[in-house]
Structure formats: C-alpha cells, structure tokens
Amino acid sequence: MKPRTLLQGLAGLAAWGCLSGLALVRLWAVLYGRVPGPAILAAAAALAALVVGAAWRLRLVPRLLLPFGPTWRTALLAGAAFFLGALLDTSYGLFSAGDMAIGRLPFRLVCALGSGLVLAGVVLALATAARRFGRLELPRGRALLLLALAVNVLTALYAAGSATVYYWDSNIYWSSSTMLAGQSLDLAQVRLVLQSVITQEYNYLLSWPISLVMRVLGTGRYVYLFAIANLYVLPALAGMAALARRVRRGGVLLACATPMLLYTGLTGFVDVAAAGVGIWAFVIYTDQERPQSARGILTGALLTLVFLLRRYFFFFTVSFGLASLAALAVRRSQWKSFAAMAASGVVCSLFFGQSFLVEQVLRSNYFDTYSAYDQGRWVDAVMLCRYFGWVLMAAALVCVVWCLLRRPAARYTALLTLAQPVLCLLLFTRVQSHGQQHLLLYLPALCAALSLIHI
C-alpha cells in the first residue's frame, strides 16, 4: 500500500471517529428517552461513515476545502478553525448529561474534536467559495462615506431630539448589551454568548458587539443608538449599494427610498442586522456572473446566520429557499447554485442551529404560541403601507413585472424577487400579524426589485 493511500485511510478513520462522537451527542440530545442508547450509537456511527464516504466519493476536500491550495495557509486556517471549534463546542448545552456515561471525559473529548472538524470544514468551504466568488465592485468610497456621514448625523439628531421609551425587544437587547459590558471579557463570556444561541430566544449574538463598544464609551442611550447605526445599519446600506452598483448613485437612492431601515434601528431594534444579512444574500445569489457553487455555498451560510441573529427571520430563510426553487422554472441551468445553497444551508443550520430547528420549528406549535399577536390582515396591510409606502411597493412590482415580461436575462432574478416576499408574507401571516421590526423581512426583496431598473 502506498504511503499516501495509507495516510488518507488513517485520516478518514480519524475523521469518522471524531464525527461519530459529535453525531452521538447531537442525536442523544434529540432521541434519548425515545430510542435506546445502543441504537443511537449505531446511528451516529453510520451517519459519520456516510458523511466520510460521501466526502471521499465526491472528492470534497480537493474541490471545496483547499482555499489556498495544499499550502501552509490552508493548514493554518484549518488548524485555527479546528482549535476554536473544539474549544468552544456547545453540544453538551443541548441537554443535561447528569451522571450518564455520555457525559464523561472521553465522550466530551471526541465530541469536541468532531465539532472542531466540522467548523474547520465549514470555514474552509466558505473561504474557498469566497475566493472563487471574487471581489464585488462596490461604488466609490465617497458614496459610502456620504452614507456613513448622513447616518451618524441623523442618529445624533434623533437621539438629541427624541425621548423614546424602549420596551420589549429593543429594551431586551439594550439591557443584555449593558449586562455583557459589565462582565469580564474572557473565554467564559464567549461561551456564554454561544450558549445563549442554544438556550435563549433573544440570544446575545447581536448584543455582544454592542457591549464591546459600551466598554469604551459607556452604556447610555446615545452609545446604544450609535452602535446600532454603525455596526448594523451601515453594513445593510453597503448591501444596498452593492445591489444597485450598476446604477449611478444607486445605493444612495435606495437608502433614501427606504428610510424605515434607519428608523427601525433608531427605535432600538437590532433586527436591522438580520435585514442587512438578507440583503447581502440577494446580492450574492443573484450575481449570475459568478460561479454557481460559490454563490450557493455563501448564500446558504447567510441564510443560516440570518435566523440565528433573529429567530423570526427563519420565515425569510424558508421563503428564500422556496423562491429559489421556483425560479429554476425560468432558468434550469442555475440548479447547481440551488443545490449548493441547500447543502450549505442544511449543514450550517444543523451544526449551528440544531436546538432552534428541533425545539422551536419541529416541536412547537407556533399557531398557539403566537395566536394572541394575530390582529388580522388589515393591520398587516396598514403596517406595510405605513413603513414602505404604497407608491414604493408599486414601483418595485412594476420593475419585477417588466423584467418578467420584457427582459429574459432578468427573469430568474425577477421571479426570485417576486416569490420570496409573497411566500414570506403567506407564511408569516399564518402565525401572527406584523410588528414594526417584522417588516424588515421584506426589505431585502424590495431593494432587489428596485435595483432591477438597471436591466
């Protein structure tokens, strides 16, 4: 046997062992009490073998996991991701191990190694996809600088001239940011933030960056609003500029046409960060000049991130996936991008968001939980017109219909842009009515529709 073949076999065996440990703990969190322990162990081993076999059969390592080729830079990136994944593994936060054997050190160690291996694979795949996707040609720096200046001036004027009372979501995130800012900045706090993704509806993913600013500038209202504006609103505006990059001053025009983004941030809703991620998902997935696999992998990760930031954005994720599938009806050649997006989204969702998918999506009855928030469809229509304006929505619809009827090259993007908000509206209104922050679900598609004007 050749040394190279032997090394590959040993590496595959080691990967199988690590993944078996991770799969055992993840399956135990879901199946224990319903399925016997030995059956869970067998299922974990079989699942790990299936993953390793598929990776070998499809040659995923040379195709997707070598962003810099077989070089020291790839090894360094993989090693760093593996170390962080093993060190910060939160799999045991999914259940209480108690005195069970699965809670002992050998199982914890193998699970941590499996978590490190998966995170290394995710990071390498995203790095490879990003390099193949290439750089986006954003507008000149002066336009972005103008947007940043305008946002900060408006934030200062609003903060000085208003006395907003923050309650519910906005107060929760301000309070959690203040709480994190008062704690020691160490590994324990990082673990606390990651554990919150598993255990809390309002996790600390968006509070933690704000808390870093508060450590330096204080925990007052001005600091909170400026942190939201600069950390979360500005990246969303940069996404608008990327969407409308083929139109002269397109980013500025989109920003002016959708003031509800900044206003929602100024009223204390960190949800604008999730809307920004959704905008970037449209930017990447609809750029048909880029490699399909790269677009799909990056978009799948963004669609996972968006609902990790704010749970209700899962409606955006599901509707985007269904709309992407529907859009294949007008351009079947884009199936690779959809397949890559689906695979990336499934892997990232199961690894980072298993608790949410199992406990809140599969086991919860949303119709009963949120029935008190259902105020009828008239309220939804009023909210949409109040925050977007019927003229702007009509203009977006005209752009989409025009491209569907007159611009064959843009039909794929136009159908995606039309189907996503419609599906999202149908899904969301089956559960509850919209609050102010929930309207951010439709902002990415609205911006994408208006940006079709250049085609």
What are the language-model segments listed below?
Residues L212, V223-R249, W280:
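Transmembrane-helix motifs of polytopic, lipid-linked glycan transferases
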Residues L19, R73-L87, R142-V153, A255-C256, ...:
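Transmembrane alpha-helix segments characteristic
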Residues L50-R63, V118-F133, P235-A241, L325-L328, ...:
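Hydrophobic, aromatic-rich transmembrane alpha-helices
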Residues I172-L180, L194-T219, F226-N230:
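Short hydrophobic/aromatic helix or loop-helix immediately within or flanking a transmembrane segment
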Residues V330-R377, M383-V398, L425, T429-R430:
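Membrane-lumen/periplasm interface segments of specific transmembrane helices
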Residues L262, R295-R311, G321, V422-L425:
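Membrane-interface alpha helices of multi-pass inner-membrane proteins
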Residues M1-A23, R34-Y158, A340:
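Start-transfer (signal-anchor) and selected internal transmembrane alpha helices
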Residues Y263-A274, G435-Q436:
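Short acidic/glycine- and proline-prone juxtamembrane loop motifs at membrane-interface regions
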